[in-house]
Amino acid sequence: MLVFDAHLDISMNATEWNRDLTRPLEEIRNREALMLDKLDRGKGILTFEEMRKGEIGICIATQIGRYVALDNDLPGWHSPEIAWAQTQAQLAWYRTMEEAGQMVQITNRKQLNSHVELWQNNPADDLPIGYVLSLEGADSIITPAYLERAYAYGLRAIGPAHYGPGRYSPGTGSEGGLEPSARELLEEMQRLGI
């Protein structure tokens, strides 16, 4: 069987929570047992080993970098440029996992079909996890011109809104419609096929 997970904040778990997802789950939980910096420390459920056990061979893997304005008390980055840099750190982690054979990026139908065939015809024990790169909230897209760069590195999906106020669109817990800057963002997304 092959399971497709439609949303995993996998790079955030690694780069912001400092979780080595190549290690066993119990080891990660034990290492976090006395940590108090984040609400759900010691309760992680995701590792590459656990994904393979569950036959999760493909996922939508996110990048996330929320910008927060001065009047916003949510956690996030204090400028779109810092948020962009955070997403680039997450991208670097994905690339490192690719080099280690843990993951493989899927950017087109041919790669998808090949990866599905690999997982259907081999034991999952050591297979790479396929991922389609997504951006959760568009706050880190400094200007819509950055989308072309993002598409070139493999970004294939964007949810313009996430949680709270956003640069392009309000998210969960916020009211309002698309910001004026969202029109150009959406047009560029459509042009690129994101």
Predicted regions span which residues?
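N-terminal hydrophobic targeting/anchoring segments and the immediately downstream early-domain regions
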Residues: 1-180, 184
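Substrate-binding cleft of carbohydrate-active enzyme catalytic domains
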Residues: 186-194
